[in-house]
Amino acid sequence: MSLARSCIRLAFAGFVVAFSGVNAQALELASQKDRLFAYPAVLSSSDGGAYRVVDYREMRDINGRDAVPERRVDGRYISTGVRRAQQDLALQTKAGTVRHVAVGKTEGASAIVLYLHGQGGNRRQGVDDFTFGGNFNRIKNLMAKSGGLYLSPDFSDFEARGAQEIAALIAYYAERSPGARVFVACGSMGGALCWRLAQDRVTADRLGGLLLLGSMWNDAFLQSPAFAERVPVFFGHGSEDRVFPVGSQEAFFRKIRSSAKGYPARFVRFESGTHGTPIRMSDWRETLNWMLAQP
């Protein structure tokens, strides 16, 4: 091969790498009813905005938002046409069969988001258009409109077997969408799986962020591959959570921030909110775009 051709190929390769890097950094989820899902008033903010206390009122944020409180949101908050991009699937893996609902591009996705339910939940919870104020409908639309993939799976338990099933699901879709970052949102007890996945080096290398919604803490995260990779973490928590006390989660958030200078972690406290409030109120687009913007 001539020297000139070698130089041309090297220059072209450099251009492709640079162009790909720009695209990865520039990915931003499309808008989806942003005004309706924006946080109410921020009551206080600290740590450079990493910690916020947000106003939450049941009469406004449940009764004023739902046509049937906690069962059916007002139609303004949802766009059900996204169901055309929704599939109920079963994946055969070495860890077993993983039933899951997929919304969006199952190959060549720009980003991948999973929701892992809590105790008593199932794969259908994460794709229910009408409950939790329409917030699951919003994430479905956000991913479908942005060329991404949203997954809501079943799993056997919140321990090693469940983590293996979810890791296998992530691996399958990540291999079909090279370069797509993977974001795992864990509701309540589902957080046990978030922290287990953080310990798996192969999975951690694929993670673009963890979202803990009314969930638990785990000090072992500070020694995990995900922590070493500075995987962004978001905490959404109700101040009146009786399952996982907010003070313990706030203390864990501060421990993360103090253990690694500038660690990308955010905390939104919903004042007067309860255990399920973060699933209803967390702003998917704001949080995921912040995570996507991290180096």
Write out the residue ranges for each language-model feature.
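Short amphipathic alpha-helix adjacent to the substrate-entry channel of hydrolases
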Residues: 127-150
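N-terminal cap/lid segment of alpha/beta-hydrolase-fold proteins
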Residues: 46, 51-107
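Short alpha-helix in the alpha/beta-hydrolase fold that links the catalytic acid
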Residues: 245-256
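Short beta-strand element of the alpha/beta-hydrolase
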Residues: 109-120
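Primarily recognizes the serine-hydrolase "nucleophile elbow" in alpha/beta-hydrolase
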Residues: 176, 181-229
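Short beta-strand/loop motif that positions the catalytic acidic residue
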Residues: 229, 234-237, 241
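Alpha/beta-hydrolase active-site loop
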Residues: 156-177
